[in-house]
Amino acid sequence: MVPEDVYQSKKSELLYLQKVTGLTDTLKAQLDELSKQVHQMHDNAECVSSVLKNWDSILNSISQATLSLLQYTENDYEVGAWSNGSRPEADKEPPLPETLVRVNVANESQE
């Protein structure tokens, strides 16, 4: 081989390797950004998970409050139903749902 041909071959190989290096650096930067986004998605998923853990107790509390209202009839909510004199003074207010109290039921070891 002529030294000029070897030189041109090595030069084209060098250009090719520089192009591959540039593409590799770009890919590395994109993968680093993707890694950050996946980590952020993981953190956000943990937050959503902790919120969703409470939904069972929230729905249970709403259900209990709703069930406590079922003991009253439609007449209990009518205007003037308390002024007929047949009810004590304490019952002259319209019936309200039971007061809900928040109680932490999580184990101390989970926190």
Swiss-Prot record:
Pfam families, sorted: DASH_Dad2
GO biological process: attachment of spindle microtubules to kinetochore; cell division; mitotic sister chromatid biorientation; positive regulation of attachment of spindle microtubules to kinetochore; positive regulation of microtubule polymerization; protein transport along microtubule to mitotic spindle pole body
Coiled coil: 17-48
Keywords tagged on the record: Cell cycle, Cell division, Centromere, Chromosome, Chromosome partition, Coiled coil, Cytoplasm, Cytoskeleton, Kinetochore, Microtubule, Mitosis, Nucleus
GO cellular component: cytoplasm; DASH complex; microtubule; mitotic spindle midzone; mitotic spindle pole body
Quaternary organization: Component of the DASH complex consisting of ASK1, DAD1, DAD2, DAD3, DAD4, DAM1, DUO1, HSK3, SPC19 and SPC34, with a stoichiometry of one copy of each subunit per complex. Multiple DASH complexes oligomerize to form a ring that encircles spindle microtubules and organizes the rod-like NDC80 complexes of the outer kinetochore. DASH complex oligomerization strengthens microtubule attachments. On cytoplasmic microtubules, DASH complexes appear to form patches instead of rings.
Family to which the UniProt record says this protein belongs: Belongs to the DASH complex DAD2 family.
Its job: Component of the DASH complex that connects microtubules with kinetochores and couples microtubule depolymerisation to chromosome movement; it is involved in retrieving kinetochores to the spindle poles before their re-orientation on the spindle in early mitosis and allows microtubule depolymerization to pull chromosomes apart and resist detachment during anaphase.
Protein name: DASH complex subunit DAD2
Gene (UniProt): DAD2
